[in-house]
């Protein structure tokens, strides 16, 4: 850790007074008395300060202060007593961690320190109250920012953790927004070759993913969401790239994806329509013979 004096310089586009303010707020994170306001101000400014992440990471005690904010609310998780005020405060800390997670200069160190694991207790929560929903969504946002970078090290790290079952649970029972971010994270893991191989490595893993995606399709046929459906279809399409998964999907792909159930929802979404057509084509083509030598019956 370095002192603030050696932190990465802020581009000169920021006025000198703003730069001094940023330094002041970062210093104020170290003190419990001034931390809450500093969290609020820095989270508001995070979009306009391109190098905020290195400044946070390399300044003394800052990351420890952000982690303290997270750990402080663990007792409010079970039993679930989290208030709106507590939720807003910790979500400001999470917003700053998201900034560190998505910056190329700090992402590797962020993973090496295993900081995402501090957020997993929040993803385990099931309370439907607004403070908890906001907490889950913001925590998912940090993981979403990591996978958005399409970096192999991110996927390798996540596969050593319980992120897939956590995402699957939120995909099954979260709010529409949380479901969308959780499905996006799963999609990004699947789009990586290591991630696809990991999920298709055992029948248990694949069947868990396929079961949840199937439930989501059923739910989406009753309460359509074009944005969520797009991610679900992309997950199915990517699974169909794996020969073993493709065979299984021939048996378990929901009928709603084969008929006109979603025609109205997708009428203006050419990308998802193309993915869906490709998925159906993949499942129809190249029916391989069973390794035991018995030809598989045509579907």
UniProtKB/Swiss-Prot annotation:
Pfam families: Rcd1. Keywords: Acetylation, Activator, Cytoplasm, Nucleus, Repressor, RNA-mediated gene silencing, Transcription, Transcription regulation, Translation regulation. SUPFAM superfamilies: ARM repeat. The keyword Repressor applies. One of its GO terms (biological process) is cytokine-mediated signaling pathway. The keyword Phosphoprotein does not apply. It is found in: Nucleus; Cytoplasm, P-body. Detected in spleen, thymus, prostate, testis, ovary and intestine. Changing residue 227 to E: Loss of DNA binding. The modification N-acetylmethionine is found at residue 1. One of its GO terms (molecular function) is protein domain specific binding. It comes from the Eukaryota. GO terms for cellular component: CCR4-NOT complex; CCR4-NOT core complex; cytosol; membrane; nucleus; P-body; protein-containing complex. Component of the CCR4-NOT complex which is one of the major cellular mRNA deadenylases and is linked to various cellular processes including bulk mRNA degradation, miRNA-mediated repression, translational repression during translational initiation and general transcription regulation. Additional complex functions may be a consequence of its influence on mRNA expression. Involved in down-regulation of MYB- and JUN-dependent transcription. May play a role in cell differentiation. Homodimer. Component of the CCR4-NOT complex; distinct complexes seem to exist that differ in the participation of probably mutually exclusive catalytic subunits. Interacts with MYB, ATF2, RARA, RARB, RARG, RXRA, RXRB and RXRG. Identified in a complex with ATF2 bound to target DNA. Interacts with NANOS2. Directly interacts with ZNF335. Belongs to the CNOT9 family. This is CCR4-NOT transcription complex subunit 9. It comes from Homo sapiens (Human). The lineage of its organism: Eukaryota, Metazoa, Chordata, Craniata, Vertebrata. The gene is CNOT9.
